[in-house]
């Protein structure tokens, strides 16, 4: 079993594979670094930290930890909370940009094939996922993501070292609004390898788009573009390599076309782009032969198709490929001369035209992407630098020279900002520090780009190109001689017969000077520009906007000077941002997973300067910040600094650090900055800051939710009121109460939640009273969801290991659409009947208005029609047939009573309920009467004279008493301001004290026994004893037990429900409560329960 099967990469029990952060290595040597990287690589851990620098080893396979799950995991997480990951670095950049209001950039470096392009894709994908936004922002995100396949198709190719090598460099700026939404972007591209269009080395390919077009073109496109087999084209068959392992050119072509569409390319524009690509291929098939020392097109037929595709005359194409117009000056006069070319010059002209066409097409695509992402003004940005890696081939030419120069500049930035600048900053700020030695590659950069004293290689090259008009070997040999004279004694330069050697930071590279001057000139002859401007295609003419009739003064710019300027501009741009670094390592040359070449990796570790990086990081400080910036970021931690510190900034920083109890040895105060040593101390600050913001966010959220809830309650009350308006009397204490919905707290009641579907939303849940065929009250839990009504009861387990235990059981699950209607009376009672197909359900709930209103809403949503409601004072409900009889209907009659307490009287198949008058039927809730806060369930008043077990007791039989202070009198629970959900208890009009009615003598329906009794002297003594520690006393003698009223069983009775008492004949039962309904409560053998009063006689 492999390690991947035994351990999940993010489990807390994960296998420790080396160290996550190489600052923690016990030995700081190249060998120790390589061993740690190897150990992690073999266990599929491709990321490792050196402080904030991310080291990435190319696995050459798809890894499993780049899913949405990891995006959620790393979003907002502190760096060391989770294993090293590119998402952690990206999230850190994104959050710092928003918090510090500073532009960020990430510099991805490494040699060709080390995984830089893939890393850039993951960064863009993460940002796209975690940033919000509407349709416009989503469009920009799509452009950002789809620009990758488009630019890869036209700018990437297979090389000996990398199957998807970037043959151009790009700096991608993702621009953001102040809210962190990507709303724009900009791409800067550098030095496209144009020579690849016309020539490739062995085992290499041209740019991907050529192979995609030949493989994926439709039948119509093949006919229109003259598509043939790949080996037919000279620009493709030189290397005899057409396929790449693991690449599907046909599928990639579809992706490229899709990306074009996202960029806003219409179908006609896409066709013109592909037509130009095909035209370049056909142009390469024009060959030349010698005729009288001059070049002649070998086959005139080969001119027809490229001329057709480019929209030019085939005769003019032939003329411009075999001759050139040259301007000569004689004694102040200038004249144009047509010069006929030889075979070598004609082939050079053809290739120059092909390279020029492709380069301008590529620039057009980049500009089109930029236009699609353009925004009027820049706010914040994150830059991603994905540039060609350091390259060493068997034969290295001008392109490799430029590529390696740019990589040398990037290494210099890394050294400047992580090694050199850090140490210089400690000195400037007066921080105690031990200097660390490192190699500064500025000396190599100066060798290449110096202008004077001594001139660098590029300056010498430009000078040769300006003074030597000849092309070919003559100019190149002159270059070699001048280089020997100018920089021959430089310690990082050597020359040999055919070229020179530069000792780069990544090692020695031998360059062949053959073709250096030609490629550096990078001039497209004016004849060819005129030829393209004569095209009948607007698209092609747009690619050549030059005005040739205006004389150009000065020396034309060279490729070397352009790349030097671009490199220096790039450095300036990067230095304006807060930099982050990803150092990519290529583990092998085979491009196979789990293949590790020790010497190759060690060489990369050495030239990337990882050892020096670890030493500086260990000896230095993980975080440094200007006092003002530090105060701005962490001001929220103390009241004195929020919203801003009004005193000296240095003292403000010290106040913050003292407030969070940071140890003095964990930081140092410089002259303008504070330096924090360990990342853990920084994480402490960040965590406290997050908690503060979280607390404020919760406060705002709570206020907003309260506002929304109040508005929602008002709407629900209005809807409920409209259902009962002019049809049913209302209770004073319920008309203005809040609707809560879940009165049972189902989140903490798994025994009830088990009956519901997974993630089923609950609209209403409460304990209610159900009446059976004998009008016996039974406790039930009623739950309403968007689709069903659940009635849940309890039963005692009769067998098995849980015998005797009481368990919840599902008594009924009713589909809402199966309801036939709901019946209610016109009185102010709490009773309602759910009319079903087989048998009805007669229920009582003090929250009936809330339940019925929600039920009506859900029924209408499900059935697309209103729920039938019946309001009558004589109701019927059907009961299920049991055994030989017992089916049929039961009647419920409502009549006027003397008091507002419902009185129930059962007789045969009829239940009579009498109670006083309520508020008029046209009563509506008022805003003024809205009770604030959550209703207190324990303060509910009884609504009728029924056995205690079904209304005045909670689930375990204990009497419910109010939580409020003071005596529990009738005058308390009738006021809606105190107990908003009080039911139809005594109905009294609120009056002044002077107008209150005189006390009535107690009647058989008096509820004064519910009041809390007078505390008396015992209460006063109890209050005096609060806070005094009692003296331990001896155990008192047991008092003789006093007997209350008792009764003897005349018949045997077996309880039908868990709250009923079972007994045999002649057993004596202690009477606890006698109820006029005929159901008494008693105690027998230590158990309490209900029993029928007509089964016993008093003794």
Swiss-Prot record:
Keywords: Actin-binding, ATP-binding, Calmodulin-binding, Motor protein, Myosin, Nucleotide-binding, Phosphoprotein, SH3 domain. The modification Phosphoserine is found at residue 1025. The gene is Myo1f. Expressed in liver, kidney, spleen, eye, brain, lung, small intestine, testis and cochlea. Barely detectable in heart. GO terms for molecular function: actin binding; ATP binding; calmodulin binding; cytoskeletal motor activity. ATP binds at residues 110-117. GO terms for cellular component: cortical actin cytoskeleton; filamentous actin; myosin complex. This is Unconventional myosin-If. Residues 728-917 form the TH1 domain. Residues 1042-1099 form the SH3 domain. GO terms for biological process: defense response to Gram-positive bacterium; negative regulation of cell adhesion; neutrophil degranulation; neutrophil mediated immunity; neutrophil migration; positive regulation of neutrophil migration; regulation of actin cytoskeleton organization; regulation of innate immune response. Myosins are actin-based motor molecules with ATPase activity. Unconventional myosins serve in intracellular movements. Their highly divergent tails are presumed to bind to membranous compartments, which would be moved relative to actin filaments. It comes from the Eukaryota. Residues 579-589 are annotated as: Actin-binding.
